[in-house]
From Swiss-Prot:
GO terms for cellular component: lysosomal lumen; lysosomal membrane; lysosome; synapse. The active site is at H42, D287. It is found in: Lysosome membrane; Lysosome lumen. One of its GO terms (molecular function) is acid phosphatase activity. Belongs to the histidine acid phosphatase family. It holds the Pfam family His_Phos_2. It is an enzyme of class 3 (hydrolase). Glycans are attached at N92, N133, N167, N177, N191, N197, N267, N322, N331. It comes from Rattus norvegicus. The chain crosses the membrane at residues 381-401. The lineage of its organism: Eukaryota, Metazoa, Chordata, Craniata, Vertebrata. This is Lysosomal acid phosphatase.
Amino acid sequence: MAGRQSGWSQAALLQFLLGMCLMVMPPIQARSLRFVTLLYRHGDRSPVKAYPKDPYQEEKWPQGFGQLTKEGMLQHWELGQALRQRYHGFLNASYHRQEVYVRSTDFDRTLMSAEANLAGLFPPTEVQHFNPNISWQPIPVHTVPITEDRLLKFPLGPCPRYEQLQNETRQTPEYQNMSIQNAQFLDMVANETGLMNLTLETIWNVYDTLFCEQTHGLLLPPWASPQTVQALSQLKDFSFLFLFGIHDQVQKARLQGGVLLAQILKNLTLMATTSQFPKLLVYSAHDTTLVALQMALNVYNGKQAPYASCHIFELYQEDNGNFSVEMYFRNDSKKAPWPLTLPGCPHRCPLQDFLRLTEPVIPKDWQKECQLASDTADTEVIVALAVCGSILFLLIVLLLTVLFRMQAQPPGYHHVADREDHA
């Protein structure tokens, strides 16, 4: 009986000690989402331009060329709804201005896409309704003039070094072979469209126009057969590779997509060291923006980013306090976002590894790296000459000042004290 009581007392003591340990031990922090960056393409739009023989000119489109359509508005509203569901519990259910910052390129279609997206992401709560009959609230979208945009409008320029890389790309076997293989096809398309000097780099305009017209139920001309449109689509994808790859992809990335990636990484690093807002940073831009970024990350799938597609960066704080980055690409509204893996890192990539692996494509000084080698040398010589000239000028001025003062002194001048000493 005494042994049983002793056993019970030992068990009670162990339970008591365990409870005390749990009370004094710091709680284990669960893995948590800390920050999200989104880059999405605008929604469905009208063609950017028509070709000379196009039966559908600008007056065919309600708002003219390059404008967001009702379909595009709906695509982004639905994306906003999907994001609202994905980040339920992370973002406030109602719009809170300190949680969200949105920047767009200065195009009607990207600005309107961002607004439609925000309408789906943050429908007004009862207290936010300014009119009971309108289920919408204004949310700010920021932008800069196109001529000043050095973040989202690609390709970035002017950049002589990038243009030099493009000229080198035109001399590669891949580009040359593609030109030879498609020479007759390009001539045929040029003849049917009335376009002059059609190249691998400009053919995408023809595909884009036909794609927009076909998407909106317009009858294509007889020459634009399914086989022709498919061939145009393949050349259009090649034009994206030409812009950001094929030749010296890392150097191109430093001058193009790496600029945007640098800003994204700067924001991720900042959010890992502070609890400041915002929680969500959104960029509304173009297919070229997405391709430039994904080529810099080396995760591009070789296909044009569809309307309202969205590249997602999620910053997590792990239960051990460290930070990790996960990437996703939503390019199909009927499927969950596709996980993207940075080469050399698992999908849940530690932030420090993410920064290290992307360092080769991050420019140190974009303006300087954009200069040609001869321009850089000339600039250094000019600066050196300017410095030497300035120093020489100052020495001459100083010398002239001394000489002037010496000549200004009267020749018979003596101190009074001297006169008294020799009286």
